């Protein structure tokens, strides 16, 4: 007969937090190094630890990535096991530390009294600088140069831990106002990185495979095993490439743009002669010069198949979101003139929002329009406008499902020359990617463009007379931004949660403002400008073209004179 004491049939009594603190029977000291025992749930001061007293100087307040057992629960000695903190866990520690400093300065820091309001902190001015200065005190993970680029979207995904200010995207706070509860045993902390319940309840993915017929050989058992559907495995939510139709109609796979890397489908440039040194039958490796290829542009303007966040669902020019804010851009951009596109707000489930506007290709796709210097946006909630994560009042009431929104950008040009005044051609012509790496991916060639957005942000200059204007159901809301940074801007939309919106890129608009051109007309114009940009690149880099010497012809001198004139014009 099973004993009534212990055994499987008896549930363990839930742990309750003790009322005393530390070996010294003192009080909590928020803002200093403290650790909690995973067995008795008692908090201990870093200075009072027996075997690990060095934590008082080497540790940081509000650490959450460790397991500690006190000497009262483990008589032989204290036990300490540190765990590697990821970005979200680091942010919990940093926000708690900075919040404690703010509350202490205001005379409100106490373990007995919980603040009524959230303690908001600036991501740009407080959180990121603190993490940069104390990185290796917070984690053993190697610090990357652009680690903070996607910090805001990362925090937004952990809704049980962080809250964002309604009117300022740069301000974040801890959802837990009682700092005395923060530690490795906090329920929200324990769920960091765990998959949401709705993902856990997804139906297992079954893959239908055709029956394998043939004689019973040694490999038959392996083939039978391959026929069985795979269940229970976690599906990879991220993706590395998108499948789409190329301009020539062929279905291809194209890598997603992400983390300062962008990819452009190419074709052989018919204006560049083949290298006579190349022999397709040679056994040694041959590196194809990238200038032998050119970017293959879409004949029409549409939502880009790869210059978008991977988690967005694209159907034609309709975009549906997933979880936190993420962005999609159009396939063509503008750097001069007055251009216009519209957005139809198709579906707005509860607590979902969108932002629309214009962004440069350097703007992060895992963030919202208006998150940094490279984008300007307008939010459906409250009608707030955003730039550099700073929200300002713009159009009272915002917009909602069923509304038609217009986006206009004006980048002034010289009336006679029809180009921006006092700007070199490389500032308004599309970039020639002939000087970038040429890579092979899924049987196609792509230009791989890698540029540090942080470095480019330092070189931005305002364009006098430029502006962005938004329209609500055909009526102007006024100029939202003036004297914006010069650069190439793309129609952009970012979606929060599962809202759906459609980009209307022309040629039929509900309301085309006077003097503006529909963005659809940019397709033909960019074809010509891209060709000119490539020609200028070839002329300026001619000395690097590695072709063998040829026999001089009578017209060589005339050709040299023409090329010399072109260089002088450049």
From Swiss-Prot:
GO molecular function annotations of the record: transcription cis-regulatory region binding; zinc ion binding
Assigned GO CC terms: nucleus; Set1C/COMPASS complex
This protein's record includes keyword 4Fe-4S: no
Keyword line: Chromatin regulator, DNA-binding, Metal-binding, Nucleus, Transcription, Transcription regulation, Zinc, Zinc-finger
Tissues with expression: Expressed in somatic and germline tissues (at protein level).
Disruption phenotype: Decreased levels of tri- and dimethylated 'Lys-4' of histone H3 in the somatic cells in embryos and young adult animals. Increased dimethylated 'Lys-4' of histone H3 in primordial germ cells. Decreased dimethylated 'Lys-4' of histone H3 in the distal region of the germline. Reduced fertility. RNAi-mediated knockdown results in the extension of lifespan. Decreased levels of trimethylated 'Lys-4' of histone H3 in L3 stage larvae. Leads to a deregulation of fat metabolism and to an accumulation of mono-unsaturated fatty acids in the intestine.
Residue stretches making up the B30.2/SPRY domain: 270-468
Top-level division of the source organism's lineage: Eukaryota
Cited SMART domains: SPRY
Major subcellular location class: nucleus
PHD-type zinc finger segments: 19-76
UniProt keyword annotation of Nucleus present: yes
Disordered: annotated span: 201-242
Gene Ontology BP term (one): programmed cell death
Protein name (Swiss-Prot/TrEMBL): Set1/Ash2 histone methyltransferase complex subunit ash-2
């Amino acid at each position: 007969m099973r004993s009534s004491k212990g055994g499987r049939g008896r549930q363990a009594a839930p742990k309750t937090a003790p009322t005393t603190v530390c070996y010294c029977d003192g009080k909590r000291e928020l803002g200093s190094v403290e650790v909690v025992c995973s067995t008795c749930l008692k908090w201990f001061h870093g200075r009072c630890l027996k075997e690990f007293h060095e934590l008082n100087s080497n540790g940081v307040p509000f650490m959450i990535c460790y397991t500690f057992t006190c000497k009262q629960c483990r008589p032989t000695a204290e036990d300490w096991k540190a765990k590697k903190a990821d970005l979200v866990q680091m942010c919990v520690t940093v926000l708690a530390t900075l919040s404690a400093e703010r509350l202490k300065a205001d005379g409100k820091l106490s373990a007995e009294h919980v603040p009524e309001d959230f303690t908001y902190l600036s991501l740009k001015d407080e959180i990121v600088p603190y993490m940069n200065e104390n990185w290796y005190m917070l984690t053993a993970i190697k610090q990357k140069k652009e680690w903070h680029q996607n910090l805001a979207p990362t925090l937004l995904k952990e809704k049980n831990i962080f809250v964002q200010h309604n009117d300022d995207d740069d301000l974040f706070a801890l959802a837990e106002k009682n700092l005395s509860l923060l530690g490795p045993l906090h329920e929200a902390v324990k769920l960091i990185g765990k998959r949401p319940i709705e993902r856990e309840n997804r139906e297992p993915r079954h893959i239908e495979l055709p029956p394998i017929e043939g004689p019973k050989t040694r490999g038959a058992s392996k083939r039978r095993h391959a026929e069985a559907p795979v269940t229970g495995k976690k599906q990879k939510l991220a993706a590395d490439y998108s499948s789409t139709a190329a301009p020539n109609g062929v279905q291809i796979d194209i890598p997603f743009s992400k983390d300062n890397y962008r990819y452009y489908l190419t074709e052989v440039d018919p204006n560049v002669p083949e290298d006579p040194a190349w022999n397709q039958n040679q056994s040694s490796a041959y590196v194809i010069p990238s200038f032998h290829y050119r970017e293959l542009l879409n004949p029409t303007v549409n939502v880009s198949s790869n210059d978008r966040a991977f988690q967005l669902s694209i159907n034609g020019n309709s975009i549906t979101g997933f979880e936190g804010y993420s962005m999609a851009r159009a396939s063509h951009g503008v750097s001069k003139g007055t251009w216009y596109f519209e957005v139809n707000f198709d579906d707005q489930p509860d607590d979902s929002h969108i932002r629309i506007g214009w962004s440069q290709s350097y703007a992060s796709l895992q963030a919202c329009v208006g998150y940094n210097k490279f984008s300007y946006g307008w939010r459906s909630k409250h009608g707030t406008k955003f730039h550099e994560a700073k929200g300002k009042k713009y159009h009272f009431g915002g917009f909602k499902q069923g509304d038609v929104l217009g986006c206009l950008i004006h980048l002034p040009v010289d009336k006679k020359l029809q180009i921006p005044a006092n700007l070199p051609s490389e500032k308004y012509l599309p970039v020639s990617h002939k000087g970038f790496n040429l890579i092979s991916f899924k049987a196609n060639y792509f230009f791989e463009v890698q540029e540090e957005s942080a470095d480019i942000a330092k070189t931005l200059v305002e364009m006098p007379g430029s502006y962005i204007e938004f329209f609500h159901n055909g009526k102007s809301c006024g100029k939202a931004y003036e004297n914006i940074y010069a650069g190439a801007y793309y129609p952009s939309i970012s979606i929060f949660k599962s809202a759906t919106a459609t980009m209307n890129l022309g040629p039929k608009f509900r309301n085309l403002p006077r003097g503006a051109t529909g963005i659809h007309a940019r397709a033909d114009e960019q074809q010509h400008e891209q060709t000119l940009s490539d020609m200028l690149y070839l002329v300026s880099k001619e000395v690097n073209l590695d072709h063998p010497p040829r026999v001089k012809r009578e017209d060589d001198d005339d050709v040299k004179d023409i090329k010399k004139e072109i260089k002088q014009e450049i």
